[in-house]
Amino acid sequence: MEIEKTNRMNALFEFYAALLTDKQMNYIELYYADDYSLAEIAEEFGVSRQAVYDNIKRTEKILEAYEMKLHMYSDYIVRSEIFDDILAKYPSDHYLRDKISILTSIDNRD
Protein backbone atom coordinates (compact mmCIF):
# COMPACT_ATOMS: atom_id res chain seq x y z
CA MET A 1 0.00 0.00 0.00
CA GLU A 2 1.36 3.41 -0.92
CA ILE A 3 2.32 5.55 2.06
CA GLU A 4 1.06 8.75 0.38
CA LYS A 5 -2.34 7.22 -0.27
CA THR A 6 -2.53 5.86 3.25
CA ASN A 7 -1.67 9.25 4.72
CA ARG A 8 -4.21 10.99 2.49
CA MET A 9 -6.99 8.53 3.32
CA ASN A 10 -6.26 8.84 7.03
CA ALA A 11 -6.39 12.64 6.74
CA LEU A 12 -9.62 12.61 4.74
CA PHE A 13 -11.08 10.15 7.23
CA GLU A 14 -10.26 12.55 10.09
CA PHE A 15 -12.15 15.35 8.35
CA TYR A 16 -15.13 13.44 6.95
CA ALA A 17 -15.64 10.37 9.17
CA ALA A 18 -18.85 11.78 10.62
CA LEU A 19 -20.37 11.75 7.12
CA LEU A 20 -19.77 8.01 6.63
CA THR A 21 -21.89 5.06 7.69
CA ASP A 22 -20.71 2.98 10.64
CA LYS A 23 -19.63 0.17 8.31
CA GLN A 24 -17.67 2.55 6.08
CA MET A 25 -15.99 4.08 9.14
CA ASN A 26 -15.08 0.68 10.57
CA TYR A 27 -13.65 -0.71 7.33
CA ILE A 28 -11.62 2.40 6.48
CA GLU A 29 -10.28 2.79 10.00
CA LEU A 30 -9.26 -0.85 10.26
CA TYR A 31 -7.71 -0.89 6.79
CA TYR A 32 -5.84 2.42 6.80
CA ALA A 33 -5.33 3.40 10.44
CA ASP A 34 -4.95 -0.04 12.01
CA ASP A 35 -3.31 -1.72 8.96
CA TYR A 36 -5.65 -4.71 8.89
CA SER A 37 -5.66 -6.85 5.76
CA LEU A 38 -8.82 -7.31 3.70
CA ALA A 39 -8.99 -10.90 4.95
CA GLU A 40 -8.76 -9.83 8.60
CA ILE A 41 -11.55 -7.29 8.17
CA ALA A 42 -13.68 -9.83 6.30
CA GLU A 43 -13.22 -12.38 9.07
CA GLU A 44 -14.07 -9.86 11.79
CA PHE A 45 -17.32 -8.82 10.09
CA GLY A 46 -18.27 -12.20 8.64
CA VAL A 47 -18.26 -11.06 5.02
CA SER A 48 -16.20 -11.88 1.95
CA ARG A 49 -12.86 -10.29 1.21
CA GLN A 50 -14.38 -8.96 -2.03
CA ALA A 51 -17.19 -7.26 -0.10
CA VAL A 52 -14.64 -5.49 2.10
CA TYR A 53 -12.58 -4.48 -0.93
CA ASP A 54 -15.62 -3.09 -2.75
CA ASN A 55 -16.75 -1.16 0.32
CA ILE A 56 -13.30 0.34 0.88
CA LYS A 57 -12.99 1.40 -2.78
CA ARG A 58 -16.45 3.01 -2.70
CA THR A 59 -15.63 4.78 0.55
CA GLU A 60 -12.34 6.09 -0.87
CA LYS A 61 -14.31 7.62 -3.75
CA ILE A 62 -16.82 9.10 -1.31
CA LEU A 63 -14.05 10.66 0.79
CA GLU A 64 -12.43 12.14 -2.33
CA ALA A 65 -15.81 13.48 -3.48
CA TYR A 66 -16.35 15.18 -0.12
CA GLU A 67 -12.91 16.76 -0.40
CA MET A 68 -13.60 17.94 -3.96
CA LYS A 69 -16.74 19.69 -2.75
CA LEU A 70 -15.77 20.90 0.72
CA HIS A 71 -11.97 21.36 0.53
CA MET A 72 -11.56 20.92 4.28
CA TYR A 73 -8.28 19.01 4.07
CA SER A 74 -6.68 21.15 1.35
CA ASP A 75 -7.74 24.35 3.16
CA TYR A 76 -6.21 22.99 6.37
CA ILE A 77 -2.90 22.38 4.56
CA VAL A 78 -2.90 25.90 3.10
CA ARG A 79 -3.68 27.45 6.50
CA SER A 80 -0.88 25.45 8.12
CA GLU A 81 1.61 26.62 5.50
CA ILE A 82 0.53 30.25 5.95
CA PHE A 83 0.87 29.96 9.74
CA ASP A 84 4.36 28.48 9.33
CA ASP A 85 5.36 31.31 6.96
CA ILE A 86 4.09 33.98 9.35
CA LEU A 87 5.88 32.43 12.32
CA ALA A 88 9.11 32.17 10.31
CA LYS A 89 8.92 35.79 9.18
CA TYR A 90 7.89 37.23 12.57
CA PRO A 91 9.40 34.84 15.14
CA SER A 92 9.38 37.35 18.00
CA ASP A 93 5.87 38.72 17.49
CA HIS A 94 4.00 37.29 20.46
CA TYR A 95 0.66 38.74 19.34
CA LEU A 96 0.82 36.85 16.02
CA ARG A 97 2.07 33.72 17.76
CA ASP A 98 -0.90 33.82 20.17
CA LYS A 99 -3.44 34.36 17.39
CA ILE A 100 -1.96 31.54 15.31
CA SER A 101 -2.05 29.30 18.36
CA ILE A 102 -5.77 30.04 18.79
CA LEU A 103 -6.48 29.37 15.12
CA THR A 104 -4.47 26.16 15.20
CA SER A 105 -6.36 24.93 18.26
CA ILE A 106 -9.64 25.58 16.43
CA ASP A 107 -8.39 23.56 13.45
CA ASN A 108 -7.30 20.67 15.68
CA ARG A 109 -10.34 20.28 17.93
CA ASP A 110 -12.50 17.19 17.63
Swiss-Prot record:
Record's function text: Might take part in the signal recognition particle (SRP) pathway. This is inferred from the conservation of its genetic proximity to ftsY/ffh. May be a regulatory protein.
Protein name stated in the entry: UPF0122 protein SEQ_1180
Domain of life according to the entry: Bacteria
Entry similarity comment: Belongs to the UPF0122 family.
Cited Pfam families: UPF0122
SUPFAM superfamilies referenced in this protein's UniProt entry, alphabetically: Sigma3 and sigma4 domains of RNA polymerase sigma factors
